[in-house]
Amino acid sequence: MSVAELVRVTKRFGVRAALADVSFAIGEGEVVALLGPNGAGKSTALAVLLGLRTPEVGSARLFGSDPRAPSARRRVGVTPQEIAFPPTLRVREIVELVGAHFESPLPVNTLVEQFELGAIAGRQAGGLSGGERRRLGVALAFAGRPRLVVLDEPTASLDRVARGAVWSAIRLHVTDGGALLLTTHHLQEAEALARRVVLIEAGSVVSDGPLADLKAAAGRTLVRFRASPGIELERAERDGEHLRLLVPDGGRAVVDLVRAGVPLDDLEVRPLTLDEALASRRLG
């Protein structure tokens, strides 16, 4: 069952189409990463999905309803890119205030513990760092036990420890049957969390499917090995002391290199990471 979907959505700002015939859906218990370069239409897609903008063509649905319906909005938790808090309220007070808007919120102490907010729980919001404000904002998206969480760049400005706490909370949410849609520029994050990737470029969906399929669509394997400066190969890229090859068949490439007498010190043969697959796709 889809908990959220866009159906053939077109959204224009003046003569520019921010979204052009965009469709995708999110199922129960699914983590979907919405990826694309700056200006691709990701934020507009989120705004339409959440009922914050109305498309000229197409529709958005949350739990089968209009996304502006209170019954639908109560089941969604959101962290936008930009978020502000009353500067004199303390972190614990903000968590309590947000939780009071829901019938069955997560206990305050549970949320504080999950997102490691204990050290800042007594501090005023106006004195928080950017990363601390971000962590609080992400935590609040989970306060009402939502069935769908939408996170726009959730771990931007977070350190490794704080990012790990957010990842753990996301995994727990999904284990409990919740769905999650995130945008991120940390492709390692998408790779660690998402089972499915929706790739948007210039307002259109150019790929929608399992992460493994996106990598396979690049049609290439990475072969990397240490090579002295005097060794150069056709289609190989220099990477410091190493050469990198993107090839359809890694095993065959290694055999060919050995037959050609190329020394393969510090050899690495592996599938592309998400970052490498996207770069390979853009380069054709």
Q: Where are these predicted regions, by residue range?
A:
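Helix-to-loop junction immediately C-terminal to a conserved catalytic motif
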Residues: L50
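Conserved ABC transporter NBD signature motif
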Residues: V57-A72
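Conserved ABC ATPase "signature" region
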Residues: E96, A100, P105-I120
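Short, charged/small-residue-rich alpha-helical element at the C-terminal edge
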Residues: G219-G284
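Catalytic Walker B motif of ABC-type/P-loop ATPase nucleotide-binding domains
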Residues: V149-E153
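ABC transporter nucleotide-binding domain
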Residues: V166-P248
